[in-house]
């Protein structure tokens, strides 16, 4: 059986919390921010949370087996 390894791209983008959820950064914060409203930019400042039972969470379990 081959060694289990974390997906290097997922490792850089997602972090597992103590409760088993995954943290991620919100998209759209790099450029072209002027036409966006302040409330939208403020919302993107917060971290996104991915629940482990969601479809994305199940994929992340496969991508990050060592976490």
From Swiss-Prot:
At the top level, the lineage of the source is Bacteria
Q: Name one GO molecular function term.
A: structural constituent of ribosome
Q: Which InterPro entries would you find in this protein's record?
A: Ribosomal_bL35, Ribosomal_bL35-like, Ribosomal_bL35_CS, Ribosomal_bL35_sf
User: Where does the record place Basic residues bias?
Assistant: 1-32
Q: Where is this region: Disordered?
A: 1-54
Sorted alphabetically, the keyword list is: Ribonucleoprotein, Ribosomal protein
Q: Name one GO cellular component term.
A: large ribosomal subunit
Its transmembrane ranges are: none
Q: Which residues form the signal peptide?
A: none
**Sorted alphabetically, which NCBIfam families does this protein's record hold?**
rpmI_bact
- Which family does the entry's similarity section mention? Belongs to the bacterial ribosomal protein bL35 family.
What protein is this chain from?
Answer: Large ribosomal subunit protein bL35
Native source species: Elusimicrobium minutum (strain Pei191)
Lineage at the top is: Bacteria, Pseudomonadati, Elusimicrobiota, Elusimicrobia, Elusimicrobiales
